[in-house]
Curated annotation (Swiss-Prot):
Designated gene of the protein: pyrE
Record-listed E.C. numbers: 2.4.2.10
Binding site for 5-phospho-alpha-D-ribose 1-diphosphate: 98-99, 102, 104, 128-136
Pathway: Pyrimidine metabolism; UMP biosynthesis via de novo pathway; UMP from orotate: step 1/2
Name this polypeptide is given: Orotate phosphoribosyltransferase
Lineage, broadest ranks: Bacteria, Pseudomonadati, Pseudomonadota, Alphaproteobacteria, Hyphomicrobiales
Protein family (similarity comment): Belongs to the purine/pyrimidine phosphoribosyltransferase family. PyrE subfamily.
Cofactor(s) listed: Mg(2+)
Subunit structure: Homodimer.
Any Pfam family matching the protein: Pribosyltran
Role played: Catalyzes the transfer of a ribosyl phosphate group from 5-phosphoribose 1-diphosphate to orotate, leading to the formation of orotidine monophosphate (OMP).
Any one Gene Ontology BP term: 'de novo' UMP biosynthetic process
Gene Ontology MF annotations: magnesium ion binding; orotate phosphoribosyltransferase activity
Keywords: Glycosyltransferase, Magnesium, Pyrimidine biosynthesis, Transferase
Organism: Rhodopseudomonas palustris (strain HaA2)
Superkingdom in the source lineage: Bacteria
Length: 187
């Protein structure tokens, strides 16, 4: 399937499985009359495969060592990308960033690294399922930077177009999205 056909098919899956209208309160606290819940798409076999493929293609030229997903929404995505990268003989390891460190055990904010493994000096991409203001991803970036990593890109599946682009620019972070909310609202 061509990239444009994959993108169109994934948009159809998102529209069917993950997009809805109706009043909802977002993680940012804002009210909205539409929402995206990408978990049903990320956990659908075809949706997961297409998300992984398009995301992998979007970051392939970034010379990435690791891809980190925000808890909980982007964890399935990070895993799918890691698996696909292995199949393409260009392995990119995955980790996830907790909203807050666990209060027991190792008390880590960044999870998924093997004992003795470190992000220090590594090039990382942070992935998010849906981005509104960018606040959650910026907090995740801070946690990953504390591990010594270089953040080369923040990549979201859907940008709600409510200030994230400006927030990432102000933070000096490159930001891209696979889709814009307007692509779903205007259909």
């Amino acid at each position: 399937m061509s990239k444009s056909a994959s993108r169109a098919r994934l948009a159809d899956i998102i529209r069917t499985r993950s997009f809805g209208r109706g009043e909802i309160t977002l993680a940012s606290g804002r009210k909205s009359d539409f929402y995206f819940n990408l978990k049903p798409t990320m956990l659908d076999p075809e949706g997961a495969a297409l998300l992984a493929e398009l995301t992998y293609e979007a970051l392939r030229d970034e010379q990435v060592d690791y891809i980190g997903g925000l808890e909980m929404g982007a964890v399935p995505l990070a895993g799918a990308i890691a698996q696909l990268s292995w199949l393409k003989n260009h392995p990119i390891a995955a980790f996830f960033v907790r909203k807050k460190p666990k209060e027991h055990g190792a008390r880590l904010a960044v999870e998924g690294l093997a004992k003795g493994e470190s992000l220090a000096g590594k090039r990382c991409v942070i992935v998010e399922d849906v981005t509104t203001t960018g606040g959650s991803a910026i907090k995740a970036v801070e946690a990953v930077r504390e591990s010594g990593a270089e953040i080369v890109l923040v990549l979201t599946m859907v940008d709600r177009e409510e200030g994230a682009t400006e927030a990432f620019a102000a933070a000096g972070l490159p930001f891209r999205s696979l889709y814009k909310a307007s692509e779903f609202l205007n259909r």
